[in-house]
């Protein structure tokens, strides 16, 4: 979808201009202020002129076919305005009005459907309804409903904002804290979607970072295609996803379905494509502005040096760094010796550094320390403690001068100014620091959370990821059927997933035949696709050492199951080799409605839903990604050897994950869920074994 006429219109008509407070007034004033005024036209049938400009009675009277029509009328008038504009040949529109499909009424939905039909008929790109509009600071286009405060003369790369909440997006865009290049409020987003805006920003050179307030998706394929391109370009995307809390999938047929909800699915997509996911607006704005100011000059590694003016600040830095998984650089002895050249005699050269109150006024000391850390390869970036309040201050004047001088002398590594507390920042200091690629971060607590997220982006390597994505087909029905354990294991074995030796007995004679080739001890289990949790109905007997015990177990299982589940269809009794126990892991598949099959791995056995130590990842998956998943688990210590225990066969476990993922991805339109639980993981070199298996398919 080309958005050229919407984003860079040469001519604009504003329908519904008024001098009363509201969108019709603010849009009229801000658009005229931003554009060449002889190609902006007011339309109001009841007024001859407004704000010193002629008003046309209808869109047909406007002396040219405009590129974009901005509709400021009540909702019931919107379709006719758009239809008239479309018939003239206008190819873009912005609709601010609410009361359409978001209202949840038949009338509102019908009105929105009319807009969609008009868009299709006239090939018109309609932003909205129920939106705040569009801002393009690069080409001086202000179609934002809420004002005209932005610097529309910039040609500097900045932040591309996309939001699905009008109010939240307006708050973000209106902040003095942001260097904005573009702003999109997509509203209901059924015509020009959030995905369309992101797609544009990924390829635009003036959007150095993309910041998205995301509620949901219309087109997952287009969204992920854009994320993939951004990952390959190393363009940061920051997303604040709303609706992260979940009550769970009550009707899920397996453990995996219970654990994997839409919020986790989104987070797993973000991880795969290198998206920076944030939890609140403070992190969102802090990171977006930091990436914008750095403009591609990112740290070479995520270890940092800290320059503060008190021991208390150093203690806070050290604590927050450890809590957030951010590493203080292990500076070399040569670095420490060179630091002594610039520090007062009573200061100790170390990291974090208490530079004493000399930090307030010793410009040359700051310049020297920055260059010293520049030469130490262990240091990826430097942070300087600086409470840059909304007032002039000697310390911050010194810092501004020092950074400017250091940059002129060739300083390359990133520098961050880190206040202890949140607050307004003195504009002159902020401008001077940012001109020298020094972001002023948020409060120190938020800063270290942001450093952690920035470190993950720095360390992200798309070449180690499988970025392939194909959206699942829309299903007409979500009815499912569970395969029996026997059939599930047969499917798994075809893809090379190790399972125990097994057979299915429907009689004592068949039991005897199976016991001829499966050695004792054995396990007997009920084999029924209608009984998912066998132990709950007395359907499992383990440690069977001879034929007499096997016959007794066979009969007892049938008795137990018929009593607990009298209506269940029984396919027989599964006779299974009793394999040696190992560390119990669950590996599963859940098929997300938007993103398709995802692989889950975690601590397994009967406690899987108690501890919920799991991680989720989109398919397909390779060996490197499988290892990454395992390392995220709290229980990875058990796999890696803990308190004298032998390390487990992690490579074999990762190999099983890849094979299960291959099966699920190749059959994604058929498979809803899979549970391999437990999977026994043996010591290194001894392999793995899926002891139990459940596959749930769509009918």
Model-predicted segments: where are they?
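Catalytic-core regions of core metabolic enzymes
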Residues: 1-675, 679-699
